[in-house]
Amino acid sequence: MFVSRRLATSARLRQFAYQPRAIPIQTSSFSTSRCHNAISDSLRQKAQQNNQQFKLDNLFNVKDKVALISGGGTGIGLMATQTLAVNGAKVYITGRTEEKLNRVAELYGKEIPGSIIPVPADITSKESIQNLADAISQRESHLSILINNAGISSHTQTTEHDNANDLRKSLFDDPDATIKDWEDVYRTNVPQLFFMTTAFLPLLKNGSKTHHGWSSTVINISSISGIVKTAQHHFAYNASKAAAIHLTKMLANEISGSPESRLPIRINNIAPGVFPSEMTTGESDEMQKSYIPKEKYEKKTPARRPGKDEDMGSAVLFAATNQYLNGQTVVVDGGYVLAAGSV
Ligand SMILES: NC(=O)c1ccc[n+]([C@@H]2O[C@H](COP(=O)([O-])OP(=O)(O)OC[C@H]3O[C@@H](n4cnc5c(N)ncnc54)[C@H](OP(=O)(O)O)[C@@H]3O)[C@@H](O)[C@H]2O)c1
């Protein structure tokens, strides 16, 4: 018998089509094949115990953890410092300006469950990182949280030119557009993540042994500038932050991801959008805090505002405590990347 090709195809398709099965009508609303027995008191108790795991105290507990934060005296580093210290961690803060660090310890380190301890260092110098590691090792047997936050921005240039000569004038002829500027921003924002992390590996490993159920963690503060496709008028800074994100992933892979190493240390990065800091505003007040008027970002971010202390604080707690987070970028930007677009 002749069957057209079209008919044969539709017959074949019907063969694989969803066939509804006849479901027997239940005589009672309680099916013994699907549900367990009635709920006993001991089962209820077990459920109560299970509920405890979801308490904030358990999920986001940093009490008695030892932390080190670079650039902890201002901006985002200060937000991270306060977050950990007011929740019971012992937080060492480092930076080049001792006065800033001391002021933070005096202002924010009193009458809180944790503590803030200044230790000055320059994270662009390997020798200074070594001295810092020695200083912390002399005081502590372990480190639970390392936040590599210190960073600087680069020279800014306009890109809004519609002819080659003007664009060249802005990007090349500008006397402040120097290779040294690129080197400076790279030196501060990138190699330090490598040298700080590797200098503290033994202390970090001890941190995982010290607290049951805790793997020590490195959190690099990168930026959405390493993700968006626009140069935001600072090519060198954005290139350095893209490098910071990639370096975080390589470190996570080599230190804890590969079967050869598998150290119990989680390495992630937080990519902030715009937050008030000395970098973004050029100054800080007597509280060592900086301020950006909300209106300035009304049209620039879907959140219609710059980031707040609490936005950064909750991201830091999440990245520090979530034991299943490793090798990732946590973007906290009020939707900036959504609007600006990524590469
Ligand atoms: N604020 C934002 O909108 C934003 C957005 C995305 C990413 N970020 C990143 O967040 C991090 C913190 O920046 P911030 O915005 O909070 O700016 P900030 O207030 O200027 O903080 C930077 C901190 O880093 C320290 N620092 C700089 N160079 C150092 C060095 N060589 N050795 C040791 N410490 C050094 C500074 O202290 P000293 O000068 O005393 O050394 C300062 O406390 C940076 O990595 C930045 O790229 C910021």
Please place each PLM-identified region on the residue numbering:
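Conserved glycine-rich Rossmann-like NAD(P)H-binding loop of the short-chain dehydrogenase/reductase
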Residues: N87-R103
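A glycine/serine/threonine-rich, flexible loop-to-helix segment
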Residues: E106, H161-D162, S258-R262, N269-T301, ...
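Catalytic loop of short-chain dehydrogenase/reductase
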Residues: I152, T156-Y186, F194, P202-L263, ...
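Short, small/polar-rich loop/turn modules that mediate ligand/substrate recognition or access, typified
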Residues: S261-R266, L325-Q328
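The beta1-alpha1 cofactor-binding region of Rossmann-like NAD(H)/NADP(H)-dependent oxidoreductases
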Residues: E99, P120-A135
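Conserved glycine-rich cofactor-binding loop
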Residues: V66, G71-G75
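C-terminal substrate-recognition "lid" of short-chain dehydrogenase/reductases
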Residues: R305-V332, V337
